[in-house]
From Swiss-Prot:
Source organism per UniProt: Dictyostelium discoideum (Social amoeba)
Gene disruption phenotype: Cells have defects in motility, and various developmental defects, notably in aggregation and adhesion.
GO biological process: cell migration; cell morphogenesis; cell motility; cell projection assembly; cell-cell adhesion; cell-substrate adhesion; cortical actin cytoskeleton organization; filopodium assembly
Keywords of this entry: Cell adhesion
Disulfide bonds: none
Protein task: Involved in regulation of actin and microtubule organization. Involved in cell adhesion.
Self-association and partners: Part of a Scar/WAVE complex containing brk1, scrA, abiA, pirA and napA.
GO cellular component: cell leading edge; cell-cell junction; filopodium tip; pseudopodium; SCAR complex
Protein name per its UniProtKB record: Nck-associated protein 1 homolog
The UniProt record lists the keyword RNA-binding: no
Family: Belongs to the HEM-1/HEM-2 family.
Length: 1160
């Protein structure tokens, strides 16, 4: 054989073989799927024709053979079928041609060499064994193609039909297809001539392979330990030990396929022992991607049926059984131990190289060996996880022997980090070995190559040696991009010559040359093949074939709370970014899109699972614990210990003791605390993982992991805000109890705790949680339908679409509060308490929902925008109620005008009879409702002022100063409306410049209605004759009337000012003063008349003192009246006596003690 063409032949054979292997795999996958293979294969009519066609395969019927009935169904679409089958036919054809060429190459090498030994010539031996393995894989894969006979027969027949000439390769290829029905048996027959060459090559591993697979031996030798000998930390590691470790994965395949194809080499105890050990490591041997073979079944068949004059394998059958048993019972544990060892060493390397990258160059061979071992173990794990062993091995299988690898994620991540680190410092490593070759390696080679050795070598060997030496001497150490392809080709030629039958050198002399050139060969690959080495040892993209177990590992990793696996979860996303570009091949370009789309879906699923896990822990476990701790500070927890000390106190039957503060730290609760810590750790590790990269491109999508988390946290906050505000679900026992939303002060404190939990995420992942919180809260408490700010007519018409916003729940509740709950009998507004209170026994506890504390919480939560929405609903209620009052006024307009003209005359009592008591009471009832709404609005505005003052004091002061620069804009002069609206929105006390109320009441006050609204003071003064005033009582302790009638003062003041300003033609506040004076005058006359009546008469109140006090309170509250305004009609002495009667009268004092503040 001409040694000069050997490198090129190997390169062509191996490259073509790998391409053909991929093409055969594509054909196998396509014809395995009935949905994508050519449609005529599934046609029942044509299937009978196809069976007849291949009945005597590879012999095919002639065209005029009438035995194939219906053959015209195929020929009618001959062109279409030829196009469908052409690629697959020529794939099989190329496989056959490659098989012939590769066998000739191996046979020529075998016949022309004394021995091929890995230790003597790494390059030649590895290439030879790689071709051997490829040979077997291609034969096996072709044998698996389901319809290979039909493909070739139909194509050959249609080729003959269309071109009137036979397809030239069909006859030989057809016989080969028949022969490989049992591919390994055929290969064994063919390889009898290669037994010696294969045996010599595999014998290289007999003494070392088993030792280098035992963990105890590896630890003892410090195989991957870089700091075992600190004094050698900077010295390069380049012995055969590490080099062989780097080839470990390939060596296993060389041994198993080699002994399977060339069983004649199993002639020594050492070879039998090597086979036994290798078989005990696995029960599936990888062929290509997801295809594996049951290696024990194949060897069992071989040992049973192989016949040879030199060896009797039947006597050795027991080793197959022992190895099969070990592969299921012992191998999982051994591989788990190996993974632990490799992971520990990789972690040590990562920490060392990251800190001292200068050590990468001298220790690169150790790193490559570690990466190779890690890759082998990772693929072994996924190939043997959750799979049922083959038939012959299943009987030894016990699922309990399986070892679940909890840290496979960290192993994948460490491999990736180290590969990236080498890429980062690639130039440094290349420089190091380029200088090494041009220096120490050349000197070492020159010492070995003596003149005497060259003289003994002969001219051909000497020429090859000189070529290599001259090339190495011509190296430029500064040329980083130097290619050593020529050197390696020359070394292969020389290695072949040294191993050839005609080589005159002794074996010891040859070893001197090969040992140094093997070393230079290794160094050269570290210069120009570093990327290829990293791809070979660190590329995990073939895990796509095991994507199901791979992503089961991901699912287990993100919920792992025992180690650091969650922090490595992003390695799966990185793999998904690599799959589309590396798994898809040039022979099936459509696959890239299919894989890419699936990777995008998987990436979306992975990020969703990670972020859901984080949010679930934060929003459920941690938040619920923090909220529980917050509840320990509730008032009841302070009262409960005091109640326990009382001897006469007994808890109710259904009483649940409150949580004792600090109880979570008690020893009996340690399990809960440990669980909390574990889940916190899990969530924060996942957050750390999201920080690994800002964004990642997967196929045609760019994923930003942090945005997934940000979106989920925002959704969790929204969900919590919406759910926690809702009232508890009513039960049968609570059906009669009034259901309210959560108290806003409680809700605010709970929300602050929940937000505090979310802020913890900011410590571990680069997300602006503050911005997220502001954005979410603004979204939840802002209605887009609000008009432009700075205008008095901002009220949107109709209903505001708020969907399920938190603001909708709060607004709906306050609408219900204003329209129903505050108007419930037993609920009154207390000026002393600055809020609403409820009488004992009233289901609705107004003091829990309508006091300044709750209003402050409301303003803190919803802000000015939310307050405007609530204020809109309050004003709409006032408008609706005022409209109904207008109807009553219209019906009684004539009587009111007549009474207004004669109220001071004796006939006024006769005129009074024209009014229905129900109308008077209805006016009072509606006015009380309006008063409640106005008081609630005032409380909200006061709270809004406090909130803005606390948060934006300078803005609030600036608005207040601007507002005080002019007199109150009672009549809505346009020049001042801008500042008026700012003052209103800031919560300032605008007094008679309440423009929003005036704007909303304009809708019921047209020019035609002016006369009606002028009668409003008269109507209010007549209401004292109604039944509501008759039954009222003034409660001094709460400064309120028992039936809440005192809120009329707020209603009367605000409505008279508003309608007076709306209907004014002069813009003079004197008009408003006259309106109030008219009310006081008529009311005073009416009340003084009541003094003439007797207790119990129709128009006489039961407690007339309360009516007098009401007028006094009204005068105090009205901004346009003063004390002397009332004294013109009711003497101060009378008012003082009324107060005295209420506060000092014994009977009233007794009654006061019975119906004191505690009843409200």
């Amino acid at each position: 054989m001409a040694h000069t063409n050997l490198p090129e032949k190997f390169q062509v054979v191996i490259e073509n073989g790998e391409n053909i292997l991929q093409r055969v795999y594509n054909t196998y996958k396509l014809f395995q799927n009935n949905k994508v293979k050519p449609s005529f294969f599934n046609d029942e009519k044509i299937s009978k024709i196809l069976k007849n066609l291949i009945a005597k395969y590879p012999e095919l019927p002639e065209n005029n053979d009438k035995s194939i009935t219906g053959f015209d169904l195929l020929t009618s679409r001959a062109k279409q079928h030829l196009e469908e089958l052409e690629d697959h036919y020529y794939t099989i054809t190329d496989a056959y041609d490659w098989k012939e060429a590769s066998f000739i190459l191996m046979q020529e090498i075998s016949s022309n060499t004394v021995s091929i030994n890995f230790n003597n010539n790494i390059q030649l031996c590895s290439k030879f064994l790689d071709v051997l393995v490829l040979y077997g894989k291609i034969n096996y894969l072709v044998s698996l193609i389901p319809d290979k006979k039909i493909i070739t027969a139909v194509y050959a027949k249609l080729f003959l039909y269309t071109r009137s000439a036979s397809e030239p390769t069909f006859s030989k290829m057809g016989r080969w297809i028949n022969d490989i029905e049992q591919p390994f048996k055929k290969i064994q027959e063919e390889f009898r001539v290669l037994n010696d060459a294969v045996g010599h090559a595999l014998s290289s591993f007999e003494l070392t392979y088993a030792k280098r697979r035992v963990i105890t031996q590896l630890r003892k030798d410090g195989a991957l330990n870089l700091i075992l000998k600190p004094e050698d930390i900077a010295r390069p590691v380049q012995d055969s030990y590490r080099i062989e470790l780097a080839y470990a994965g390939r060596i296993q395949q060389w041994i198993l396929f080699g002994y399977l194809f060339a069983p004649g080499t199993l002639s020594t105890p050492q070879s039998i022992e090597l086979l036994r050990f290798t078989l005990s490591e696995c029960f599936y041997l990888s062929v290509f991607k997801d295809i594996s073979i049951s290696i024990h079944n194949e060897f069992n068949t071989l040992f049973k049926n192989y016949k040879s004059k030199t060896i009797n394998l039947q006597k050795q059958k027991k080793i197959i059984k022992d190895a099969a048993q070990a592969s299921t019972q012992e191998a999982p544990r051994k591989h788990a131990e190996r993974r632990v060892y490799i992971r520990q060493e990789l972690e040590a390397m990562w920490n060392l190289f990251r800190d001292k990258p200068c050590l990468l160059a001298p220790k690169i061979n150790v790193l490559l060996a570690a990466l190779s071992m890690a890759k082998e173990e990772i693929f072994w794990y996924f190939r043997h996880t959750d799979v049922i062993p083959p038939e012959k091995v299943k009987k030894f299988y016990n699922k309990q022997n399986e070892v679940r690898e909890k840290r496979i994620s960290s192993l994948l991540s460490l491999v990736d980090h180290l590969v990236q680190l080498v890429h980062t410092h690639k130039k440094m490593i290349q420089n190091y070995y380029l200088e090494y070759i041009s220096g120490a390696d050349i000197l070492g080679l020159q010492k070995v190559i003596t003149p005497q050795l060259l003289q003994n070598a002969g001219s051909i060997v000497t020429q090859a040696v000189n070529t290599i030496v001259n090339e190495l001497k011509s190296l430029n150490a500064n040329g980083q991009d130097y290619s050593f392809e020529g050197f390696r080709a020359n070394w292969m030629r020389l290695g072949y010559l040294l191993q050839s039958n005609s080589c005159p050198l002794k074996e010891s002399e040859s070893k001197q040359i090969t040992s140094r050139l093997n070393l230079i060969y290794t160094h050269s690959k570290n210069v120009d093949c570093l990327d290829q080495l990293l791809d070979e040892y660190g590329n995990m993209t073939q895990l796509w074939s095991y994507k199901e177990p791979l992503f089961h590992s991901f699912d287990a990793a993100i919920v792992d709370m025992t180690c650091d696996q969650p922090s490595h979860s992003m390695i799966y996303l990185k793999l998904l970014s690599q799959f589309p570009n590396h798994v898809a091949n040039q022979f099936y370009p459509e696959e890239k899109e299919l894989i890419g789309k699936e990777c995008v879906e998987l990436a979306n699923s992975c990020l969703t699972k990670i972020t859901n896990r984080i949010v679930s822990i934060m929003a459920n476990t941690i938040a619920s614990t923090f909220l529980s701790d917050e509840q320990q500070l509730a008032d009841v927890n302070a009262a409960f210990p005091l109640l326990q000390k009382k001897k006469d106190w007994k808890p109710p039957k259904d009483f649940v003791p409150p949580i004792e503060p600090a109880s979570e730290s008690q020893f009996r609760n340690r399990a809960n605390l440990e669980q909390l810590r574990s889940e916190e750790k899990n969530a924060f590790q996942l957050c750390t993982a999201l920080n690994e990269f800002l964004d990642i491109t997967i196929y045609d999508h760019i994923f930003v992991p942090r945005e997934f988390l940000r979106e989920k946290l925002g959704s969790a906050l929204k969900q919590y805000m919406r759910q926690s505000i809702q009232p508890p679900a009513p039960t049968s026992s609570s059906s009669q109890i009034d259901i309210n939303i959560t108290r806003l002060s409680t809700y605010e404190s709970q929300l602050r705790v929940f937000i505090g939990v979310l802020i913890l995420v900011e410590n571990h992942v680069d997300i602006d949680i503050g911005d997220l919180i502001r954005e979410t809260i603004l979204t939840e408490f802002y209605a887009k339908a609000l008009g432009k700010s700075g205008r008095v007519d901002w009220f949107p018409e109709g209903e505001i679409e708020m969907n399920e916003l938190t603001l909708h729940s709060i607004t709906s509740y306050y609408v219900d509060l204003v329209s129903k709950k505050l108007n419930t009998p037993g609920v009154v507004f207390s000026p002393v308490k600055l809020g609403f209170i409820s009488k004992a026994g009233t289901p609705f506890r107004a003091e829990e929902h309508a006091d300044l504390t709750e209003m402050r919480a409301l303003c803190d939560l919803v802000g000015p925008y939310g307050i405007k929405v609530i204020e809109r609903e309050i004003l709409r209620f006032i408008l609706t109620t005022t409209t109904s009052m207008k109807e009553i006024l219209s019906l009684n307009a004539a009587n009111l005008e007549e009474f207004a003209s004669n109220y001071y005359k004796p006939k006024a009592m006769e005129l009074l009879k024209k009014f229905k008591t129900t109308d008077l009471d209805l006016i009072v009832t509606k006015s009380i409702a309006i008063g409640n709404a106005l008081h609630l609005r005032s409380m909200i505005r006061e709270s809004m002022k406090d909130v803005i003052t606390d948060n934006f004091p300078y803005i609030n002061n600036a608005v207040a100063n601007a507002f005080d620069q002019y007199n109150r804009n009672t009549f809505m002069f346009p020049d001042f409306l801008g500042v008026d609206t700012l003052a209103l929105d800031s919560g300032l006390n605008v007094g008679i410049a309440d423009q929003y109320l005036k704007v909303i009441l304009r809708k019921v006050s047209s020019e035609a209605d002016k006369r009606i609204w002028e009668l409003l003071p008269v109507m209010f003064s007549l209401t004292f004759y109604g039944n509501i005033w008759k039954e009222t009582q003034y409660k001094a302790t709460i400064d309120a009337h028992s039936n809440n009638v005192h809120v009329l003062s707020k209603t009367i003041i605000d409505l008279l000012i508003a309608f007076g300003a709306i209907n004014s033609t002069t813009g003079n506040e004197a008009e408003l003063f006259q309106s109030f004076k008219r009310f006081l005058e008529i009311s005073s006359v009416n009340i003084l008349r009541m003094f003439k009546g007797k207790q119990g008469e129709k128009f006489v109140p039961n407690e007339i003192q309360s009516v007098i006090i009401f007028l006094d309170k009204f005068t105090q509250q009205c901004p346009l009246l003063s004390k002397d305004s009332l004294e013109q009609y009711i003497p101060y002495s009378l008012i003082r006596n009324m107060y005295k009667d209420l506060y000092e009268h014994k009977n009233l004092q007794k009654q006061q003690s019975e119906t004191s503040e505690q009843n409200f």
